[in-house]
Swiss-Prot record:
UniProt source species: Klebsiella pneumoniae (strain 342)
Keywords: Cell inner membrane, Cell membrane, Lipid biosynthesis, Lipid metabolism, Membrane, Phospholipid biosynthesis, Phospholipid metabolism, Transferase, Transmembrane, Transmembrane helix
Gene: plsY
GO (cellular component) term, any one: plasma membrane
InterPro entries: G3P_acylTferase_PlsY
One example GO MF annotation: acyl-phosphate glycerol-3-phosphate acyltransferase activity
Transmembrane annotation, as ranges: 4-24, 80-100, 107-127, 130-150, 155-175
Protein name from the UniProt record: Glycerol-3-phosphate acyltransferase
Pathway: Lipid metabolism; phospholipid metabolism
Cellular localization per UniProt: Cell inner membrane
Amino acid sequence: MSAIAPGLVLLAYLCGSISSAILVCRLAGLPDPRDSGSGNPGATNVLRIGGKGAAVAVLIFDVLKGMLPVWGAWALGLTPFWLGLVAIAACVGHIWPVFFHFRGGKGVATAFGAIAPIGLDLTGVMAGTWLLTILLSGYSSLGAIVSALIAPFYVWWFKPQYTFPVSMLSCLILLRHHDNIQRLWRRQESKIWTRMKKKKAPEQK
């Protein structure tokens, strides 16, 4: 177990470092998401620059690269401490990917995937919080921020032994959203629906 656990942490980081947003955009002939739209290689930005199909592919891949390493670690009987490190490593890989010059995304979908193996009840309330916030506000970033803030409390209620690692994940996500938080405070953040409409407008002319 002593050799398996660190190996899984490293594997999780390498899995997280596979940037699906960049790869999907390359395969679809789309601009590099790091240099287009919001500049973030994630599903929301791919939705803006490439449409729903590409965005769904990125979202699924990003969730799975967080979920599968944690699920594997759980199946091998790793303790909550090591499960937490595996989850954090997957998100760190997504945020600072070794394969893409350490220019990655914000880790929201990957963190959601990493938390999912804890339980369907937790997964459901997390997804509901994220979706409801976006539907009510129109801000994708606010959905991520609210979910990250409330996630440790949800985990403490459902599976308290995972509260600390999930809190670390939340801190990572909040740190990656510091620019979004400032724009939201200044009321300068763009709503996801507004950006999609702007993209469609030239196509309709």
